[in-house]
Amino acid sequence: MASESRIAFWALLLVGCGASAPPFALKAPVTRDQDLDAINHSCKKNKKGEEECAPKMYESPFAWDGADNIVFRPLTRFFAVTPAGPAANVNALDELPDSSWFVNRIGSKPMTPEEVANGYCVEGDTLDPNDPDGSWVIDHGKDNGANPGFRVKSKGTKYMFKLDDGQIERATAATAIAARFYYAAGYWAPCDSVLYFRRSLLKLTPGLVIHPNVGKTVPLDEKRLDEMLQTTGRRGPLYRITASRWLPGVAVGPFTYAGRRDDDPSDTVPHEDRRDLRGAKIMAAWLNHFDTREQNTMSTWMSEDPKHENSTPGHVQHWIIDLGDCFGSQWAQDAIWQRLGYSNVFDWGDIGYDFITLGAVEEPWDRGVINPDGDIFGYYRTPDFVPDSWKPEYPNPAFGRMQEDDAAWGTRILARFTPDHIKAVVHIGDFTNPKHEEFLVKTLLERQAILLKRYFKKLSPIADVRVTPKGELCGTDLARKTNTYDAGTFKYRAVYQPWDGAPTQVNVASGPDGDVCIDTPVRPDVYKMGPEDVHRHGVYKIWNGASEGPLVVHVRDVSAAAGERNNTVVGIERPKG
């Protein structure tokens, strides 16, 4: 009876569609954003008389970014109510076009575990630990960031060397592992690789300094270099680091999680309204990448002429970098360390709640324990992980505007990572203790399952919608493919609504690996209609029995002869139930 009532409801709702134009036109969905097109940028001469055509460097003060997002932005938002609406860069298929921010990778085509484990490192040079002594020249100290480091130049290529600090092997592994997950998901993330090397390879350029997040600038001399190396992992005489290959192009500063870049005419969507940035909260929660401040991003000017990086035309590309905080980064204050991922460092709501309750109510962070099998990962764990409650170090403007459909989009991508993918990527961390690798794989799989169970519950997880050569309308139910819910939960049903008629139930066939197919009906007279006739439009609604909302697929029947069944998918919606 409940099923019949729901069908009757959709019948009444859809009957009203006949008087209006279909919501999706018969045209190919946007699959490539215009921000990848090269633009001409004004040039200027530097002090050496050389032309520089890249946009001006944006400086992002560490203290200001924190103060702005903790104090000033919340106050501004409180007095100027701007409720978050739908993301502004979504195409007709409820997906994202490839852009300078995001490229569809594992979410649009299968990737092997090896491909995921390679990440961005498949392109470009790599360091050789067998190089001669003194051939790795240190030419710059590492500015900002939670972990110590310095820049090295070898054979014309630059690398940022990042070291462990306290939690031996965690930070160096984290940045290499997380970068591969982000890259496979679709973000631009660097080639970060764990490396063991001998001290004699390094040659220090005199007069270098380090600009830390807080405190005074300090010299980078031989003494300080040795002190830094003492904090990182060792295997006999070899030191452990993460080598982060220098990004291509000309660095023009971090990107912001709100607003637009004034000197980039292709940057047309407010960053807080980009689905790729909103939905990035799913990846961050999975990995506990709490340090999502803008200083851990970078934008680069990508000239059309790779031999002249500072020339025009070109475009601005956006990167997520410095992921060493993932998997339980330690803070000096244990009380703050325990809260990371559960509360902002300065959380107005939690402070007020603690004040009212006098701290008598047990919070999730109060239950935190360090697992002896994963001691280097601190409080990174599965118990008490609640996706809706996860928080970064301080408020992130894009994360704060994430809607259910943005989260569902990010979760559909997360679901593509199989256990084999995760094992292959974690193995890149090169842990000395096998228990650490086992713990991290286990925790990632558990947290992934929690995220899938939460965000596949409200909106349909059916993806990869396509029309087969036989004329069937098929998709892949990612919830069933990943065994997110019990097998008995999945009970498929569907209705078809022609633009000019009443809805009818249609048969649904479910196959292995989450496959779902509908045998679409032949419309005998549709071939007589004009190509733009609205009556060629039809709507399929598919429920999987596990998710509250249906998958809504808009099709155009472009049949040109009697007896044909030639549907084209023109739009996809995932409404709430």
What kind of region is each of these model predictions?
Residues 123-257, 516-577:
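Conserved ATP-binding subdomain of kinase catalytic cores across diverse folds
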Residues 483-508, 538-543:
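Extended low-complexity, serine/threonine- and proline-enriched intrinsically disordered segments
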Residues 17-19:
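N-terminal Sec signal peptide cleavage junction
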